[in-house]
């Protein structure tokens, strides 16, 4: 009962904020409660009978978490999780306000949480996750993290706080370093997942992990591995298992990595109750996470939304553009504090853009002029630009495609009334 006053205040704040800003504003109540009742988070999560599972890394957290949660739920377990928009510390408090009781009790079997790589270590040390899955370390937000080694160090702290098993990407040298450090602790269990080199078409660019500037470590044997990847389907092997043709929510080898990580994580969570066929069918039926290959019908026509957050995700999404993306809106928002990273991407697959917009729209237009990507207009007023773009005549072939950074994504989705992150269909 000691948390009751803080929870009541937090819920009141949540209602008031939602009245002012539908579909947003969940961070403020969580922030207030985290100051008034800092012990609530650990108290709520550590009482869950199945413990806490953490999924973290630079990219792919939202999709991997959604996949793992869906698999475990299909096995009959109730899972507490956080929306991908609430993956920092106050977001966890906000999720408890929404889904917990007035005393902070969570009536679930276990928690599977997506955690921002900068916040995960602080939270993990308090809640002691049973299982942690670390997806990757990519070059991202240099203004925030300075050096990828700092991210690796933070993720290593999460791994060290894990009580049962740490799942790592065996193709990422940063994850191999984390695993090497963990191996000095005899009681620590480590599992490896990844994409086999032979699974990738020679024309595909490999996933670009952050450099370590250290001697390369030998790759580990992958326990759960993607053995083939074609279009939007994968096959994978795991100990005693071989599964063919799992459909991914969208095209791209990053989705293949998310799927194999989710499969490996769910198998570790469920143990001998894990049903591989059920897991595969669950993955095949899942829609994408919002704005990650999400397709919406607007004005009677399909529009695809693609989120790009850093050089690797921009590159992967551009490489997977097809002729379906025949009319493109490209928006870079104020979240890109250092637009110079835009120049590190190969834009050869982006031949023509209709509209360039966003807080950093002029920077993007300058970039396109430099690299030779044709564009029809620059409109820095984001909401006016998206309205004008969506009002264009339907393309004669393909569909309208919106490529945007996180800030532009949030503003556009709110403007279009897409306030529920779970309201996505396949």
Spans of features found by a protein language model:
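Phosphate-binding loop of NTP-binding sites
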Residues: 4-189
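Structural beta-sheet core signal
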Residues: 113, 132-134, 168, 192, ...
């Amino acid at each position: 009962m000691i948390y009751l006053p803080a929870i009541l205040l937090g819920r009141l704040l949540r209602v008031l904020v939602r009245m002012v800003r539908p579909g947003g504003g969940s961070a403020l109540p969580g922030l207030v409660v985290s100051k008034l009742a800092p012990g609530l988070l650990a108290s709520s999560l550590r009482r869950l009978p199945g413990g806490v599972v953490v999924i973290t890394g630079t990219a792919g957290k939202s999709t991997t978490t959604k996949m793992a949660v869906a698999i475990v739920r299909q096995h009959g377990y109730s899972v507490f999780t956080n929306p991908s928009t609430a993956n920092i510390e106050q977001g966890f408090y906000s999720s408890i306000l929404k889904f917990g009781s007035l005393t902070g009790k969570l009536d679930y079997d276990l928690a599977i949480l997506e955690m921002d790589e900068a916040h995960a270590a602080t939270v993990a040390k308090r809640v002691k996750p049973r299982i942690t899955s670390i997806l990757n370390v990519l070059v991202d937000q240099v203004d925030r993290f300075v050096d990828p080694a700092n991210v690796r160090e933070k993720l290593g702290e999460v791994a060290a706080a894990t009580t049962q098993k740490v799942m790592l990407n065996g193709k990422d040298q940063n994850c191999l370093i984390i695993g090497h450090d963990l191996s000095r602790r005899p009681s620590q269990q480590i599992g490896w997942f990844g994409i086999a080199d032979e699974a990738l078409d020679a024309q595909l660019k490999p996933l670009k992990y952050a450099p370590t500037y250290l001697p390369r470590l030998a790759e580990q044997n992958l326990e759960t591995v993607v053995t083939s990847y074609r279009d939007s389907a994968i096959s994978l092997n795991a100990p005693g298992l071989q599964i063919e043709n799992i459909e991914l929510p969208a095209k791209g080898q990053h989705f293949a990595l998310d799927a194999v990580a989710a499969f490996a994580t769910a198998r570790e969570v469920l143990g001998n109750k894990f049903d591989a066929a059920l897991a595969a069918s669950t993955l095949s039926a899942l829609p994408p996470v919002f704005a990650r290959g999400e397709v919406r019908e607007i004005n009677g026509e399909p529009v695809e939304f693609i989120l790009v957050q850093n050089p690797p995700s921009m590159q992967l999404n551009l490489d997977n553009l097809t002729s379906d993306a025949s009319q493109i809106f490209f928006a870079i928002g104020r979240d890109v504090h250092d637009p110079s990273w835009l120049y590190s991407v190969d834009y050869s697959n982006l031949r023509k853009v209709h509209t360039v917009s966003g807080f950093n729209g002029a920077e993007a237009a300058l970039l396109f002029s430099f690299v030779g990507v044709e564009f029809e207009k620059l409109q820095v007023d984001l909401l006016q630009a998206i309205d004008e773009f969506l009002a264009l005549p339907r393309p004669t072939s393909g569909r309208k495609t919106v490529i945007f950074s996180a800030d532009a994504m949030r503003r556009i989705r709110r403007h279009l009334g897409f306030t529920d992150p779970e309201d996505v269909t396949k």
